[in-house]
From Swiss-Prot:
Keyword ATP-binding attached: yes
Name the record gives this protein: Protein AFG1
GO BP terms, alphabetized: cellular response to oxidative stress; mitochondrial protein quality control; protein quality control for misfolded or incompletely synthesized proteins
UniProt family annotation: Belongs to the AFG1 ATPase family.
Binding site residues for ATP: G126, D127, V128, G129, C130, G131, K132, T133
Highest taxon in the source lineage: Eukaryota
GO CC entries: cytoplasm; mitochondrial inner membrane; mitochondrion
Keywords from the UniProt entry: ATP-binding, Nucleotide-binding
Upper taxonomic lineage: Eukaryota, Fungi, Dikarya, Ascomycota, Saccharomycotina
Gene: AFG1
Length: 509
């Protein structure tokens, strides 16, 4: 294995921050003019990707969508009149029983009567590690430059939808609505218009629906966006076939028309690659520090010195600015803030140490010991490119809330392409133990007890169905619920990927 030293890639980061600073979640126009297959061949030639016959076939099928986009002229979408949208969500109910005007945005539609004026998008589904996200990201870079585009993780998109809905209500001047003053405004038409104008091509990563509120607003929003009037082209990745979205959900029958519309507006492709790309050996960098020598205790002076050195090196590396100051003989300049105020959903959140927007540093207790939610972690991931998390203790099912928060944080950082460096009691595959094994946060009790037997059937299922390694699948068995087991196993898989040289040195989106 090759250990990546911070100084070894310092020059790359300086060049990277000078020349490549694109926010992943804002609409942008592509500067590329290559087809998806040409871009794939280019990356293979550079050694960035392995040539895979199966994936090459999938990419070839994306050529039809690319050709359609080259010739596509999206419709002009006008911002709706606030007066016409008074009545809020009740308008959606009225539309089910009435054919009258004004036309309701996002009402039920008969897919058999929909035209073909919009290019048919792609819905790519398959197991973890089969390359779905890579294929979508590759296609995203080749979208013709006359079209706007947005690439976003689905959870973050729904966070945006809910937050933007509240903002739209505040922005509308109800004083000018006459008799409608004080009444609720239907925000879906405003959202649909904004998204359609900023995202002619909308790319969702990890499309999934688990919440009834999300399902109902998504039904109306997608019905509008995928209509001829709005003309948005959808590219989505998911672990599930469209027919399995929101399965067993509350009021699912109301969501089925949305599923049918997605199937009509996209080409559904099952990605069943024989290669799990997360299992391909990569050089591991030294971003995660733990006492590799069992004779050295975490609280010892020697270990403390090593931890502090590790943190300092990686903080300075992540914090490199995108410019230099001539007065300092071209040394990198950056400023460190303590208790830095960050506004999250209208409240102030203090980051213990950071160099915005490069890096933020927390102890594990500060990050996961407090009652933070997904929205908090998504905001952090949006505002910082890298994170350092120190003093990660041994964890067990007795601190399930902290484990869940850490997994939620990790998902947010991973989905934004962020970097991570840590210090902890042990390597991540050994951090999660049985409660009786823990002596204190950073020490285990001496034991000669044989490990508990695991359900080999469940282990085999996770290996075969989801593509996890057998070691990761075994570790996940300490959790009782299937959802927890899957989330834990995915977290270990992602942590391994995030420790690779490729991940640490890739441009931050």
């Amino acid at each position: 294995m090759i250990a990546l030293k911070p100084n070894a890639v310092r020059t790359f980061r300086q060049v990277q921050h000078c020349s490549f600073r694109i926010c992943r979640y804002q609409s942008t126009k592509s500067n590329k003019c290559l087809t998806p297959l040409q871009e794939y061949d280019r990356l293979v030639k550079l050694g960035k990707l392995r040539d895979d016959t199966y994936q090459r076939g999938i990419i070839s099928s994306l050529g039809d969508l690319y050709d359609s986009l080259v010739k596509y002229v999206p419709p002009v979408v006008k911002t709706p009149n606030a007066v016409d949208q008074v009545g809020g969500w009740l308008n959606g109910l009225k539309s089910v029983f009435s054919r009258g005007k004004p036309k309701n945005i996002g009402a039920y539609v008969d897919v058999s009567k929909i035209g073909n004026s919009i290019p048919r998008g792609v819905y790519l589904y398959g197991d973890v590690g089969c390359g779905k996200t890579m294929l979508m990201d590759l296609f995203y870079t080749t979208i013709p430059n006359h079209l706007t585009k947005k690439r976003i993780h689905f959870h973050q998109f729904m966070q945006y939808v809910h937050k933007r809905s509240h903002e739209i209500v505040r922005e509308q001047n109800l004083k000018e609505l006459g008799d409608a003053k004080g009444k609720e405004i239907d925000t879906v038409p405003f959202l649909a218009a904004e998204i359609a104008n900023n995202s002619h091509v909308l790319c969702f990563d990890e499309f999934q629906v688990t919440d009834v509120a999300d399902a109902m607003i998504l039904r109306r929003l997608m019905t509008a966006l995928l209509s001829d009037d709005y003309g948005v082209v959808l590219f989505a990745t998911s672990n599930r076939h469209p027919d399995e979205l929101y399965i067993n959900g509350v009021q699912r029958q109301s969501f089925i028309p949305c599923i049918e519309l997605i199937k009509h507006r996209t080409k559904v492709i099952f990605l069943n690659s024989p290669t799990d790309y997360r299992k391909i050996p990569r050089p591991v960098s030294s971003v995660y520090y733990f006492p590799s020598d069992t004779s050295i205790k975490y609280a010892s002076k020697e270990c403390k010195t090593r931890r502090e050195t590790h943190i300092k090196e990686w903080y300075n590396y992540f914090a490199q600015a995108s410019h230099t100051d001539d007065s300092t003989d071209s040394h990198t300049v950056h400023k460190t803030f303590y208790d830095y105020p960050l506004t999250i959903w209208g409240r102030e959140f203090k980051v213990p140490k950071c160099t915005p927007p490069r890096v933020a540093q927390f102890t594990f207790k500060q990050l996961c010991g407090e009652p933070l939610a997904a929205g908090d972690y998504l905001t952090l991931a949006k505002n910082f490119e890298a994170f350092i998390v120190t003093d990660i203790p041994y964890l067990s099912i007795y601190v399930r809330d902290e484990v869940r928060r850490f997994i939620t944080f990790l998902d947010a950082v991973y989905d934004s392409g962020g970097k991570l460096a840590t210090t902890g009691a042990a390597d991540f595959s050994s951090l999660f133990v049985e409660p009786e094994q823990i002596l204190n946060d950073f020490e285990l009790r001496p034991t000669t007890k044989e490990p508990d037997s695991v359900d080999t059937g469940m282990v085999d299922e996770m290996v075969e169905k989801h593509g996890f390694s057998k070691e990761i699948a075994k570790k996940s068995q300490m959790f009782a619920l299937d959802e927890e087991r899957f989330a834990f196993a995915r977290a270990l898989s992602r942590l391994s990927q995030m420790s690779s040289t490729d991940w640490v040195t890739k441009p931050t989106y």
